Amino acid sequence: MDVKDGASGTLNDFIVDIKALGPKNGKNQDQQLFGIEVTGGSIVLGGDKLKVDLETDFIGGGNNQATAIDFSTSGSTAISAKQVDLTVASKAQNGKSVYGIAKSGNGTLKITSDVVNVNLSSATVRPANSEVNNDYSEIIGVDISGGSLITAENTALNIKVHSLATAATVDSLGGSSNKAGTSPVTGIKLEGGQGAFNGTVTVDVNAVGGSASAVEVTNYFYNTTLGQNYNDSAATVNKLQATASSKTGAASGILASYTKGSEVNSVILKVIGEADVTAETESGTAKAIAVTGQTTVEFDGNVTATAAASESAGTAYSIYTDAGTLSLQGANNTLNGDVSIKNASTLSLGNGSHVSQTALNGNLTADSGTTIELQNAVIDVAAGKTVNVATLTGSDAGIVLNQLDEGTLTVSDNKVKGLAVVASASANDLYADASEAAEALSKSIAVTNSSASGSYTISGQSGALSDGWTADEKGNITSRTTNQSLDVFGNYNAMTLVQWRNEVNHISQRLGDVRDSSATIGAWARVYGYDSSYDDNVSIDFKANSIQAGGDYRINNTWLVGGAFSYTDGEGKFTNGSADSDGYSLAAYLSGFFDCGAYVDFVGRIGRFSTDITAYSDASEFKGSYNNTTFGLSAEVGYHWKLNDTFYVEPQAELAYGFVKGDDFTGANDVRVEQDDFQTLVGRLGARIGASFADGAGTVYAHASVNHDFLGDADYTASLGSVSRDLSVDIGGTWVSYGIGAQFNTSKNLNFYGTLERANGSEYQEDYRYSVGMSYRF
């Protein structure tokens, strides 16, 4: 269909299906093949669908072409069909150039379709001595050489451009010329004019021997009709996914190039949203983002740039600049492949408004005369990769090294004030001590500060095993931050010891006051718990609730013997994680009450505690489970001294030993933990002062004790690979406990009792501890 001057209106649901076949032999076939050609007028291609399907085996070079839609008008045209499918296939080995959408002239093309699919292919393998006149050819999905092309925000533009050639000629190996070998392929090419792709753009192109470019912006083109042309070119893309591959030729995900002419032109590309750009080759050169000449390319969103060469003869660059300007301003960028900055180029990372993180999975080389600018930006250098920069500028900048070999970082002229050079968590974990890591980092870098403004600091990130630290330029440690996840584990380790220590209970808490009972058999049950905290580098809040039931038998007027079973459920919370634990224990006790008022209480205990813990650090998640078997013995003595028929004083002393058998386990971050056996030996001196109700109805009292743990060390070893650390937490020391209690005897055989208390001392605190029980004497 041909639309000329004066034409206007809307054409809905237009379908073109053309198969043009010609003689198999011949020097040239000048026929041009267009699905839709708009040379004038103003039309709208609308409806639900627009479909153009062209297939030809015509031969020809130069301007001979097969084009789905050609717009060369100076007017305004539009495509509004909901779905657009454009397919063009050239199957001749001396085939024509192939285009999906060709936009020239000074007019404007607006596309508001939901989906635009462009599929192009060519079988051209043209020898250098081709008999075809003006024998160049190319394949371009969307070609803009003048005017403007604008897509709507809802438009998804999908472009696939493929070479059907089975092999490349010798003339085309590694070359980018379109006059021999397989046709070069391009997804989107701006060689003049403006493109505003406000929706999403997905491009997939591949060539055999020719070059392949997913998106290309340039100021120059040549054809046999117009000759050499130099133009301003500018494009914006909202969201881009681009893949370019060539078997033996050059592959560029994004190519911005400049050819010097009689006038100065501008070449600008801006990607607003996220961009995922890939370039692949077997033996050619792959450049994910290539910026050459007086060109400017800017990415406002996150960028992933990947370049790969599958053979040793190939080379790959995630970024390649030669006299151009490239800016990556996204918060998270990933560069898979080497970075090469040449000939007065500038690479800028970040824009100062937010922290920009760039993962560099390749070597970065910035030659003399070039500049790397970091504005509130950090480069994270992969292990085994190096950075060699001539001039570094910016502010709030950092470089993180994941391997500390000599020569990893070289900056010839650092103009950044306070450049942070950091050993990553994984690199820091390779050293048993912070001083060793600091020394290795200082030897791995060679940073020369500008006399005017440059300076740098070195530090290490806290890893799965290592502490964080800072050091001077010579590697001398100036400050240290303990490993938060290991610190939490160590302190919670100690809380396990506290939990078992707290299972020691005074006789009045367990049984109430049974001194005056003459019943032979007793049964009792109680619930108890506490809310505690431990603050040493990290803060832990621990709550536990238990239920205990037991029974006893009075041997004679003095002695009774009994046993008990208890279950405990505990929960720990801390700023960087949480833990859950539960435990079971069995206890046997022997209690004696003497006529003089004295009493003794002996308890033996055995238990089992299980713990699940999760702790987070900047580097990793420490997650593990472990089990501890526990043993305990305690002895309490006291004297019940009646002041009169109502009031009494009861001094008390107690010694309790606890043993927690250590466990070994491996956390989710591969840190191996080997616990030592923990021990506690608590001495307690205290008293209670109370008043008894008339007729044996019960008692109320207040009590206070001074407690001291003579042991209380929780030691363990943490290891990662061949590196290990011996760590320890001391939960011993002195604390004071105090509270109130009461017992109510509702009958001769049934009584209820309870206590409420607090504890304070050193890093360990108890906001409250409660115990409520009942007993029945038969």
Q: What spans do the regions from the language model cover?
A:
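Extracellular beta-strand/beta-solenoid scaffold signature
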Residues: M1-K4, I15-G40, K51-S76, D85-T108, ...
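Parallel beta-helix/beta-solenoid
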Residues: L11-F14, S42-G47, K51, K82, ...
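Primarily extracellular Gram-negative trimeric autotransporter adhesin
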Residues: K24, S163, S177-S183, F221-T225, ...
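C-terminal low-complexity, acidic/polar tails when present
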Residues: D143, N158-K160, A212, T218, ...
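Residue-level detector of buried hydrophobic side-chain packing
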Residues: I254, V339, D413-K415, A525, ...
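Extracellular beta-strand/loop-rich repeat segments of large surface/secreted proteins
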Residues: T334-E436
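Outer-membrane translocation/initiation segment of Type V secreted surface proteins
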Residues: A383, S395-G550
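Membrane translocator/pore-forming domains, dominated by Gram-negative outer-membrane beta-barrels
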Residues: T520, R526-F778
